[in-house]
Regions:
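Hydrophobic h-region of N-terminal signal peptides that target proteins for export
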Residues: 31-40
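Short Trp-Ser/Thr-centered turn/loop motifs at beta-strand boundaries
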Residues: 122-125, 149, 225-234
């Protein structure tokens, strides 16, 4: 490669020649590393699993990514109790670093029988035990089903990699749910056929878990096939899920230390606090900061994704948190999620326990950055950006300069309602802070002027009326209220739309639950109808797929197949208003999807589950992985759908949409995330499904003896 590049440089490209000269040692190091890895490749047979009653899975892990590293060319080299297997297929995919699932067609397995499997890479003797041998075909929530829901289930689907999907032959098997600690049977049943599912490509069967009581951990044992990963219901299992998900926002904070005793010691000082006044055009990674521009200091807000820009789209985070608090105030308290809330003037951590619910503290963190972004005339910058991207390390070591983007009326428009909302909710705790935020809101609304979005105009009017009692604002609410019906058409759209004409329930929900101001019953009914319409629409989408993905086939944006929090939100709000069981059932089912109840049996949220994401496209996770800690917890990656690159057998391009995924760091359509698309709604929904409460992260419910 060096020779080819050198020839290319000789053809009149001196800059490239200089680049190659500088990078030559790096290229040599890369080649040496590759050859070293190849020479020290370690392929390990980690586990014998099943996929069916007559299909064993030899599950290998490797520290190198070579698709054909496991030798499957010679059928005779694979023998079970001395007899060659009947057929071989495989699923190879990137993980840590590569997983090889080798599917072996064998005689029907007999429970309690000892077998010896010989492979080209060694042999293993094992006993097939349907209560202990893991069956890949059982797909369940690996973290915690909500005890609030009366509809809980796992799916069963046989998929053999490049051998494709398979139906169950003969009678459908029975199953039982057992307690992991003592093997006691908790529930029984028989698989029910759901049918062929186009979204996953699977033949799907249902395992009803509705009779399983709160507690765990449990396992599902399917007669003749094997067992599931452990799972729990409610209690500490659900609280743990809510805790990890909510704290993803703390981990994503900009300008805030992320350190013990609140998290791993990722950075002990605030990051990206100096902002250069560039006022450059909106665009990802294209803003040039010379370092000669005027500067100011800013705190608050969030890193966008695997990189560190801050954008107007992020306003949906505090907005959603505030609405969730209003819908479920009894579920949120101070010191609930172990996040710092006391700081010195330079935002070094002083402690926690300020008497304000953590969910409002987090909403304030997301809000206050935009105060710094507001000019004295009320206009608000779109955000901060830079040229290129920060290095893959802790942001404490990031010397990248970030500058302001242009003043944009959409930013002022969105911020006006957000500021007013925060002013109202913080008033009981800090009246002076409330007054400051109200001034920011009024200035932003005036600056947006005729460019204010209708969605944001209603939001501002609702919050202003509820805060101040202003009758002109109330009249504006009445005049605009019919427009809220648009929520059912935009609630599941790409979240960028919420900075424009897309509707969030937050823009009008406060009026429904208002207690301190008179409200117009007709307007309340209109707003309630908008919530119900969106919830009913989502329930229809949920019923349209065998897995609870919750999307129609034609819905596609980055992360749309793991955005169940966004889809569940109208159902959750409808349940808060009516307590009708079907709505919390729907919300709960949707939120099971990313925890493992999906075709790949993958938990798409880092730090949770048994089949985990290893390679999120996240700069600080690169640092935490080098420390041996794993990725930062709570990151919900974009997941399946779309296109990308990476090693996979079979090739993902030919698979159904819910199987198009490779855990490849460079494939950002699969492995990246954003704070506003991926983390916002789950951080609000999972704590509600866990019924609030405080989780002690020193005690993992999966590792503790259960009564």
């Amino acid at each position: 490669m060096l020779r080819i590049l050198s020839v290319h440089c000789e053809r009149g490209e001196p800059k490239l020649a200089q680049f190659i000269h500088r990078m030559k040692p790096v290229f040599i190091s890369v080649f040496c590393l590759w050859f070293s890895l190849a020479a020290n490749a370690e392929l390990t047979l980690k586990e014998i699993r099943t996929a069916s009653k007559d299909v064993l899975v030899a599950y290998f892990q490797s520290n190198v990514i070579i698709s054909n590293e496991v030798n499957t060319a010679e059928l005779a080299a694979w023998r079970l109790n001395g007899q060659p297997v009947k057929a071989i297929s495989k699923f190879v995919t990137e993980a840590d670093a590569c997983d090889h699932h080798i599917y072996l067609q064998v005689p029907v397995l007999v429970n309690g029988t000892s077998y010896t499997l010989r492979t080209p890479h060694g042999e293993r003797t094992f006993v097939f035990n349907e209560e202990r041998t893991f069956c890949e075909s059982i797909k369940s929530n690996q973290s915690g089903y909500s005890a609030l829901s009366r509809v809980r289930y796992a799916n069963f689907a046989i998929w053999l990699g490049d051998g494709g999907s398979r139906q169950i032959s003969g009678d459908l098997p029975s199953y039982k749910v057992i307690k992991q600690a003592d093997g006691k049977t908790i529930a029984r049943g028989k698989l029910q056929s759901i049918g062929e599912d186009a979204s996953s490509g699977d033949f799907v069967y249902r395992i009803d878990l509705s009779a399983v009581p709160e507690g765990g951990p449990y396992k599902i044992a399917v007669q003749g096939y094997g067992c599931s990963h452990p799972f729990g219901v409610g209690a500490e299992f659900s609280r743990r899920l809510g805790f990890v998900s909510f704290r993803s926002l703390y981990h994503q904070r900009c300008g805030c230390p992320i350190a013990e005793p609140y998290a791993w010691n990722i950075k002990t000082n605030p990051c990206h606090t100096t902002v250069w006044q560039v006022n450059g055009p909106i665009g990802e990674a294209r803003l040039i900061v010379t370092g000669n521009e005027p500067t100011f200091t800013a705190f608050g807000g969030y890193h966008d994704a695997g990189d560190a820009d801050r954008r107007t789209y992020h306003m949906d985070v505090p907005v959603t948190l505030m609405t969730t608090y209003e819908a479920f105030p009894q579920m949120f308290t101070d010191d609930q999620f172990n996040i710092p809330d006391k700081f010195d003037e330079n935002y070094h951590i002083v402690g926690k326990g300020n008497g304000i619910p953590d969910i409002l503290d987090e909403a304030m963190w997301g809000t206050m950055f935009w105060e710094y972004m507001q000019e004295t005339n009320g206009q608000v910058h779109w955000g901060t950006e830079t040229k290129g991207y920060s290095p893959f390390t802790t942001y404490e070591k990031d010397s990248t300069r970030f500058g302001t983007e242009v003043l944009d009326p959409r930013s002022a428009s969105f911020a006006s309602g957000m500021f007013m909302h925060m002013a109202r909710l913080i008033k009981p705790y800090n009246a002076a802070r409330s007054q400051e935020l109200q001034k920011h809101a009024e200035a932003a609304f005036a600056a947006a002027g005729g460019d204010v979005r209708l969605t944001h105009k209603l939001y501002f009017a609702v919050e202003k009326y509820l805060l101040t009692g202003d009758e002109a604002a109330h009249q504006l609410v009445k005049d605009l209220s019919t427009n809220a019906s648009g929520y059912a058409n935009t609630y599941n759209g790409a979240p960028e739309s919420f900075a424009g004409n897309g509707w969030l329930a937050s823009y009008f929900f406060s009026y429904i639950v208002a207690r301190d101001r008179p409200t117009d019953p007709l307007v309340v009914d209109r707003f309630k109808a908008a919530i119900r319409a969106a919830a009913e629409k989502e329930i229809e989408y949920l019923a349209g797929n065998a897995y609870p993905v919750g999307t129609p086939p034609n819905l596609r944006w980055w992360g749309s197949n793991t955005a169940q929090g966004q889809y569940a939100y109208p159902c959750l709000l409808q349940w808060s208003l009516t307590r009708e069981q079907k709505y919390i059932d729907a919300a709960s089912q949707l939120m099971d999807y990313v925890q493992g109840l999906n075709p790949l049996g993958k938990c798409y949220m880092t730090g949770l589950g048994f089949n985990r994401v290893h390679n999120p496209h996240d700069r600080e996770s690169a640092y935490t992985k080098r420390q041996g800690w794993g990725p930062r917890p709570g990151i919900l990656v974009f997941g399946p759908g779309g296109t990308g690159r990476g090693v996979s057998i079979p090739a993902v391009g030919g698979l159904a949409r819910e199987r198009k995924y490779i855990d490849n760091l460079g494939s950002i359509q699969w492995s990246e995330f954003t704070v506003y698309q991926s983390l916002c709604f789950p951080s609000a929904v999972y704590p509600v499904l866990g019924q609030g409460g405080k989780y002690d992260d020193a005690h993992d419910p999966f590792s503790m003896p259960q009564k």
